[in-house]
């Protein structure tokens, strides 16, 4: 059972979250829950107040979608991201090889300086999903257009080469340009707003989706995708945070939710060390509603997403929702009731438990994480009697500057 925490705990946690910018700059906060939902109009248009602060959920001022704590840049809102529209229309040249990197960076710099304050210290999430930076990852009808367009580009640029050589030019040209676009964009963001946490939404990918595999579903990431993630060393080295998606697939049976989420996060932890002396923070994206039905996540769903993220030692989660959750007064009240009755109490419980475990087991110098990732019943939860417990199922992931089994040893 998850205890419904009282007013004292709510007020105490709220006081901890007053200076949210400072909180995001300091990794020594065990687990953060951020709000990336366009809910501002619930208050401004319909008069429905969503008490996010009191529930321990970090939001932008006025609950705006873009702000000082989290900003997400979509494909058509940032720089000159090249892609093909649903009708085959090429935007910004369509493929990375066709766009001017200098022009892209100039426009991106203007947008960063305009949209993010000079003291920005939140999450800066780039949502570029149309193509994958490695050639082999662009399969399926939606992404094969990038291979075809790249081959056409190579035929035009290198007409004297034979088809095999042109195909090689298409592949290398695509991958080099894609890398330059993504890598330089991250470097630019970190140069202009160095206190922000910059990364790409959905990366690293895992490829463990549900394909009606029934009893042989393991949740493991696809071996080919693990290999590609290893090849993307440059992307992890250029990032300052990782934002994998743990959206629950519509047809995935609930019995497999935990293993689905666990393997996605474990792959993120694996690449988080690449090119860095200390692991990158991992903040997983959680969708508030089920895509197929629009239903809010149940308490069990929250345990298998937010709860598993906390128990594995993630830095936090980002809650995402679309405009439908604030489309009317009725929908806003539905969101309000869900926040107050289900989501909020669970967030308070997990963040309080993560802090307690950090202090009791890791001397406040690390995050608690499962000793055995397969230990499916152990969660960072406070019990109804408020017994914080010994957290025997958890080990420590030490913060920068600390080491040892309980993070008690200073590390230069």
UniProtKB/Swiss-Prot annotation:
The entry's cellular-component GO terms read: acrosomal membrane; acrosomal vesicle; cytoplasmic vesicle; early endosome; endoplasmic reticulum; extracellular region; lysosome; plasma membrane
**PANTHER family xrefs:** HYALURONIDASE, HYALURONIDASE-3
Q: Reproduce the UniProt comment on modification after translation.
A: N-glycosylated.
Family stated for the protein in its record = Belongs to the glycosyl hydrolase 56 family.
Residues the record marks as carrying a glycan:
69, 216
Q: What does this protein do?
A: Facilitates sperm penetration into the layer of cumulus cells surrounding the egg by digesting hyaluronic acid. Involved in induction of the acrosome reaction in the sperm. Involved in follicular atresia, the breakdown of immature ovarian follicles that are not selected to ovulate. Induces ovarian granulosa cell apoptosis, possibly via apoptotic signaling pathway involving CASP8 and CASP3 activation, and poly(ADP-ribose) polymerase (PARP) cleavage. Has no hyaluronidase activity in embryonic fibroblasts in vitro. Has no hyaluronidase activity in granulosa cells in vitro.
**Which PROSITE patterns does the UniProt entry name for this protein?**
EGF_1, EGF_2
Coiled-coil-forming residues are: none
Q: Which domain of life is it from?
A: Eukaryota
Gene that codes for this?
Hyal3
GO MF, one example: hyaluronoglucuronidase activity
Q: Where is the signal peptide?
A: 1-22
Q: So where's the catalytic machinery, residue-wise?
A: 129 (proton donor)
Q: Where in the cell is it found?
A: Secreted; Cell membrane; Cytoplasmic vesicle, Secretory vesicle, Acrosome; Endoplasmic reticulum
Keywords in UniProt for this one? Cell membrane, Cytoplasmic vesicle, Disulfide bond, EGF-like domain, Endoplasmic reticulum, Endosome, Fertilization, Glycoprotein, Glycosidase, Hydrolase, Membrane, Secreted, Signal
Give the EC class as a word.
Answer: hydrolase
Q: Which GO terms describe its biological process?
A: carbohydrate metabolic process; cartilage development; cellular response to interleukin-1; cellular response to tumor necrosis factor; cellular response to UV-B; hyaluronan catabolic process; inflammatory response; negative regulation of ovarian follicle development
- Record's protein name: Hyaluronidase-3
């Amino acid at each position: 059972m998850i205890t419904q925490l009282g007013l004292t705990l709510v007020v105490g946690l709220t006081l901890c979250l007053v200076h949210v910018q400072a909180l995001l700059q300091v990794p020594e906060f065990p687990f953060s829950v951020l709000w990336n939902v366009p809910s501002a109009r619930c208050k401004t248009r319909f008069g429905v107040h969503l008490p996010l602060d009191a529930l321990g959920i970090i939001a932008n001022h006025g609950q705006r979608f873009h702000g000082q704590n989290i900003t997400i840049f979509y494909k058509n809102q940032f720089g000159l991201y090249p892609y093909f529209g649903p009708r085959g229309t090429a935007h910004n040249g369509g493929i990375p090889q066709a766009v001017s990197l200098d022009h892209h960076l100039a426009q991106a710099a203007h947008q960063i300086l305009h949209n993010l304050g000079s003291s920005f210290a939140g999450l800066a999430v780039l949502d570029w999903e149309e193509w994958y930076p490695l050639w082999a990852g662009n399969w399926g009808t939606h992404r094969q257009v990038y291979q075809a367009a790249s081959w056409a580009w190579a035929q035009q640029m290198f007409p004297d080469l034979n088809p095999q050589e042109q195909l090689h030019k298409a592949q290398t040209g695509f991958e080099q340009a894609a890398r330059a676009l993504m890598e330089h964009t991250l470097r630019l963001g970190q140069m202009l707003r160095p206190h922000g946490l910059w990364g790409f939404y959905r990366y690293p990918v895992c490829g463990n989706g549900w394909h009606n595999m029934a009893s042989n579903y393991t949740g493991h990431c696809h071996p080919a995708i693990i290999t590609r993630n290893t090849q993307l060393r440059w992307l992890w080295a250029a990032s300052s945070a990782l934002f994998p998606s743990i959206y629950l697939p519509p047809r995935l049976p609930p019995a497999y939710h935990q293993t689905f989420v666990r393997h996605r996060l474990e792959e993120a932890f694996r690449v988080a060390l690449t090119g860095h002396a200390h692991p990158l923070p991992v903040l997983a994206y959680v969708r508030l509603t089920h895509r197929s039905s629009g239903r809010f996540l149940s308490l069990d769903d929250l345990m298998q997403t937010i709860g598993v993220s906390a128990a594995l030692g993630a830095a936090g989660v980002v809650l995402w929702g679309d405009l439908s959750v604030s489309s009317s007064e009725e929908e806003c009240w539905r969101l309000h009731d869900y926040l107050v009755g289900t989501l909020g109490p669970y967030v308070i419980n997990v963040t309080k438990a993560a802090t307690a475990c950090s202090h009791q087991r890791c001397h406040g110098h690390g995050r608690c994480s499962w000793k055995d990732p397969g230990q499916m019943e152990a969660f960072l939860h406070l019990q109804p009697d408020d017994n914080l417990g010994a957290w025997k199922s958890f080990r420590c992931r030490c913060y920068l500057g600390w080491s040892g089994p309980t993070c008690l040893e200073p590390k230069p």
